[in-house]
Amino acid sequence: MNHKKTRLGRYLTIFGLLNIFVISFTVPLLFGEWLMWQPRNTAVEMMISTIYLAMGIVMIRIAQDPLPHKGFIDFLIVANLTHALVMLIYAESLWHILFDASAIALLGGLPLFFYPWGLRQFLRY
């Protein structure tokens, strides 16, 4: 259980930093057209970016002691996997499926590999 807790803490720190510095504002502002689905909707992009920013801040905050925050970690997993599913449904090309949806699904589902409560406890309260 302890090594899973440590790995989960590392994941929360790394993915939290990615959320803050890469996924939130960096991608829409720096890469613009290249990584954005078309047609662009800047208001929606910024709203989604702020959600990822907030999630990143909380992930870093709870990384030191993730076990009391099972509900939030379950939310992260479900939110990212369902986000990837919606991206998969609306993907207009193979490139979007392979790059965007796969990355979100992998990063979002990764905690299930070292889920410290045991997979039988996923979404159980």
Task: Please provide the spans of the model-predicted regions.
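Hydrophobic alpha-helical membrane segments
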Residues: 71-88, 105-110
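Membrane-helix boundary connector in multi-pass membrane proteins
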Residues: 63, 85-102, 117-121
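Membrane-water interface at the C-terminal end of transmembrane alpha helices
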Residues: 105-125
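Short, hydrophobic transmembrane alpha-helix segments
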Residues: 32-38, 61-65
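Core segments of alpha-helical transmembrane spans in multipass integral membrane proteins
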Residues: 17-25, 42-63, 75-85
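Juxtamembrane membrane-water interface segments of multi-pass membrane proteins
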Residues: 1-5, 59-71, 125
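Cytosolic juxtamembrane helix and N-cap/initiation of the first transmembrane helix
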Residues: 1-18
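A loop-to-helix transmembrane entry motif
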Residues: 10-15, 35-52, 100
